Amino acid sequence: MMGSKIQFKRPDGSFCDAYLSAQQQGRPGVVVIQEWWGLNDQICGIADRMARAGFNAIAPDLYHGRVTDKADEANHLMSGLDFPGATHQDIRGAVQHLKTNGSSKVAVMGYCMGGALTIASAVHIPELDAGVCFYGIPPKEFADPAAIRIPLQGHFANRDDWCTPAAADGLEASLKACGANYELYRYDANHGFCNDRSAVNYDPASCNLAFERLQVFLSKHLA
């Protein structure tokens, strides 16, 4: 890993642990939101990849040190997460940290659970400039996509039984109806196709194509 563990201050004044992979002052920022496994090496690796692409990247530890590779435990951790607190405190605090440390524009990107939190962040965090969501959508009562006022890019899998194609259709319909600035892409892949630790779901061709699209999108909207 090329970054380091840090702490940043949340809006409520308390602190949150995070992994920071910084490029240099003045570069645009990206907050990378974990999957339901926790802040593991795979998510830190994505932050490193974003740093190599020219961004200052930070991944907040939403589970406060807890990490697992077992689905049952991951589901338990996700079910116990305070989603409003994660959005309004941890993720917003990470956005503010990047902005106060030289990134004039900041995006949030996330996978699975983090994808749902990306949409929630796009709705609720006023300092945010763009969002990139991978195969995750929050309940509409928590974060209505019709309220999004920043550019949003979405990446979804056609063979996904967690964030289903029908759910992606519903998201697109909401974004289209409110005139949102959005891009939505679909891949002939499984849920989690960007997780290179998953022998079953990882699809390098789809993942690399999504990353290319992400870079173009962020370069445009964070310039």
Name each region found by the language model:
Residues M1-A223:
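N-terminal cap/leader regions of alpha/beta-hydrolase-fold enzymes
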